[in-house]
Amino acid sequence: MSKTQILHISDTHLGKRQYNLDFREQDVYDTFSQLIDIAIKEHVDGIIHTGDLFDINDPPNKAEIVAIRELKRLKEAGIPFIVIAGDHDSPKKFTAIYPQKILEEFDLIKFLSKPDTPYKLGEITIYGISHVPNVAKERLKELLSRLKPENKKSILLLHQGLKEVLPYEGAWQIQIDDLPKAFSYYALGHFHTRRVFQLDGGRIIEIAGSPDILREEEIEGYEKEGKGATLIDFSGDIPTIQKINIDVRKQYVVTLNTNNLREEIRKLREKYDTNNEKKPIFHIILEGKSIPKNVLMKELQEINNFAPYWRIYKDNTKEKDEKDVKIDLPTDTTIENLIYNYLVKIANFSETEARMIVDIINRADEREYVKEELMKMIGVENDNKKN
């Protein structure tokens, strides 16, 4: 019995610059290179790519150069690269062409541009339909109904929204019942998190996912399923699959409480600062009391010492209107008590920090204008001020 293995990859999005960062664009190229390394190392019989090879229809020169360089490695190893287009790299204008056509012109890929014309890889027949938008979903269903593979060992490549995965109006074009039943394997792109559906008769729907974390919503899926490619073994009558993970830059959604921000950042560094060459990205959820933006950003700058990029993902801090804040003061209050109460109850300093500031002030020059300015700052006029 001959052993036939195919590597399924998808949604590589070459040219993608997450948050417009140079190093994130390079990360995307590095993950693609890792996938090619896997294909060569595993001596696979072919690679199938289910759409969004490029992030846009008119990719930057660097993305095309990376694609050409890596696909030449595959060609030299005798491994065919069979591909369809996704919604990102499909033409948006009638006069535009698929970037895959350029690669096919140099005999680097096999672009499945005709649904009824399969590619034969040994005893396996591979069909493919590039992304079809919502406005033409009835036409897509008609195309699917007409597909009849020549043999049992057959693969259908698609890049579509599937209702069972994304059941929102306008987000899907087909559902599982729309798939032609004669295929043994359905390889899907478009979704960035891995997923597998086992159907009757040993049929499999498999979503390879994107090989890198391209949106913060993918982090949870990455932590559960990893990122990389799927190795499909067609040696038996029923295909079997194996996930192969690759090394990607980690991203985390973390919660920081502004009530004790410095300590929170210290713990964050202690937990995530590693010797890994690819430092992580943080998506920060803020909790606690609202603090002045300049104070907040100054504190958060500390994260730059152990992460190349961070962003405030959600701000759940509670706003406090200083005009509505009232401090109950005893009749015999002192300037020190006024300052202390302001620092703790309005400026959100800790009690320790407030005492330290008051102590510093007490050790400073006792000139009258210092007290006057401090009293203005906290909104208390000096009734004893001499005119």
UniProtKB/Swiss-Prot annotation:
User: Which residues are in coiled coils?
Assistant: none
What's the stated role of this polypeptide? Part of the Rad50/Mre11 complex, which is involved in the early steps of DNA double-strand break (DSB) repair. The complex may facilitate opening of the processed DNA ends to aid in the recruitment of HerA and NurA. Mre11 binds to DSB ends and has both double-stranded 3'-5' exonuclease activity and single-stranded endonuclease activity.
Q: Which cofactor does it need?
A: Mn(2+)
- What is the main EC category here? hydrolase
Organism, as annotated: Sulfurisphaera tokodaii (strain DSM 16993 / JCM 10545 / NBRC 100140 / 7) (Sulfolobus tokodaii)
Similarity comment: Belongs to the MRE11/RAD32 family.
Alphabetized InterPro entries for the sequence: Calcineurin-like_PHP_ApaH, DNA_Repair-Maintenance_Comp, DSB_Repair_Mre11/Rad50, Metallo-depent_PP-like, Mre11_archaea-type, Mre11_N
Q: Which Gene3D superfamilies match?
A: 3.60.21.10
What EC number(s) does its UniProt record assign?
3.1.-.-
Source species taxonomy: Archaea, Thermoproteota, Thermoprotei, Sulfolobales, Sulfolobaceae
Q: How is the cofactor bound?
A: Binds 2 manganese ions per subunit.
Its name, as the record gives it, is DNA double-strand break repair protein Mre11
Please give the activity regulation comment for this entry. Nuclease activity is regulated by Rad50.
| Keywords on record | DNA damage, DNA repair, Endonuclease, Exonuclease, Hydrolase, Manganese, Metal-binding, Nuclease
Can you tell me which residues form the catalytic site? H88
Q: Name one GO molecular function term.
A: 3'-5' exonuclease activity
What the record says about the induction of its expression is:
Part of the nurA-rad50-mre11-herA operon, these genes are cotranscribed.
Chain sites annotated for binding Mn(2+) 1:
D11, H13, D52, H192
Describe, as the record does, how this protein assembles with itself and its partners.
Homodimer. Forms a heterotetramer composed of two Mre11 subunits and two Rad50 subunits. Interacts with HerA.
Query: Which Pfam families does this chain map to?
Result: Metallophos
Q: Give the binding site residues for Mn(2+) 2.
A: D52, D87, H159, H190
Q: Which biological processes are named by the entry's GO terms? A: double-strand break repair
Q: Which interval of the chain is the signal sequence?
A: none
